[in-house]
Curated annotation (Swiss-Prot):
Organism, scientific name: Clostridium novyi (strain NT)
Pfam families tied to this protein: NadA (PF02445)
Similarity field: Belongs to the quinolinate synthase family. Type 2 subfamily.
Note accompanying the cofactor annotation: Binds 1 [4Fe-4S] cluster per subunit.
Residue positions binding [4Fe-4S] cluster: C85, C171, C258
Designated name of the protein: Quinolinate synthase
Residue sites binding iminosuccinate per the record: H23, S40, Y111, I112, N113, S128, H198, P199, E200, T215
Length: 300
């Protein structure tokens, strides 16, 4: 049944001139039918540059929205509309406006993991891989960073000349990991294990890392390192790409499972491609304002 569905998806892709984009955290079978696998920034960039008319975005809602904002003339379909990012929903447009009123001299930087409405009222977006560079390149010394307090504190550590005002948002998958989890894992797997940590983790976890970086950064580090054993401290879906690129290395994961990222399935991909349903729609006014923040990220 699964093989049959995969064949049908491949056929439909050609018929409908569609490209399938899947985030590293997606289920293995979804990654297997994708044309491109990557982090949110890479996938949104691919969607903007690809020749296909239709983008099937397998991730969570903010990613599909961002793809639509930067590719307004393409049809963006989202297999499972209920797959939202809880962190993105921890702040509203109204919250941002109140922060701006309270800190009128501050520039507002939002993590790409935020809604289209929030993106429409900030100065610039960033990703976990370019956040430090973006903040350093802003002229203002006062920066409101939202919604992720953990990534925000990591930025503050690496931009000491800036004052970072944080929002109390977090990724529930990364935020639950504590230093004791890392210590326990090292006791189990050996102190020689390389600990690779996503910056959405708490400071106490980052302090025990051998490397801190985005999902793509973690994959690149493992690929280029001579070490053979790694503890991967991010969502478990990234293991598929790590094993594919490094078959001779050992990877160990913590219990880090994003149920929202796992909502997409090849059945939903097939259904939305077949029926052209679940198209991403964004208010034109919001889209016009949000695109400025995303485009400024490219310029910085």
């Amino acid at each position: 049944m699964e093989i049959d569905l995969k064949d049908k998806i491949m056929k439909l892709k050609k018929e409908k001139n569609a490209v399938i984009l899947a985030h590293f955290y997606q289920p293995k079978d979804v990654q297997e039918v994708a044309d491109y696998i990557g982090d949110s920034y890479f996938l949104i960039d691919v969607g903007e540059k690809c020749k296909e008319d239709t983008i099937v975005f397998c991730g969570v809602k903010f990613m599909a929205e961002s793809a639509k904002i930067l590719s307004p003339n393409k049809k963006v379909i989202f297999p499972t509309p209920k797959a939202i990012c809880p962190m993105a929903n921890m702040i509203t447009k109204e919250d941002v406006l109140k922060l701006k009123e309270k800190h009128p001299n501050a520039k507002v930087v939002c993590y790409i993991n935020s809604t289209a409405e929030v993106k429409s009222v900030v100065d610039v977006c960033c990703t976990s891989s370019n956040a430090i560079e973006i903040v350093n390149n802003l002229e203002s010394n006062e920066i409101i960073f939202l919604p992720d307090k953990n990534l925000g504190s990591y930025i503050q550590e690496n931009t000491p000349n800036k004052k970072i005002i944080l929002w109390d948002g977090y990724c529930y998958v990364h935020n639950k990991i504590k230093a004791s989890d890392i210590i326990k894992a090292k006791e189990e797997y050996g102190n020689d294990i390389n600990v690779l940590v996503h910056p959405e983790c708490r400071k106490e976890v980052r302090e025990l890392a051998d490397y801190i970086g985005s999902t793509k950064g973690i994959i690149n580090f493992a690929q280029n390192s001579n070490s053979k054993k790694y503890l991967i401290v991010t969502e478990c879906g990234v293991i598929h790409e790590l094993k594919k690129k490094n078959p001779d290395k050992e990877f160990y994961m913590l219990d880090m499972h994003c149920s929202n990222m796992k909502m997409n399935s090849i059945k939903e991909i097939y259904t939305c491609l077949k029926n052209y349903n679940n198209e991403v729609k964004i208010d034109e006014n919001i889209k016009r304002k949000a695109v400025r923040a995303l485009e400024k990220m490219h310029s910085l």
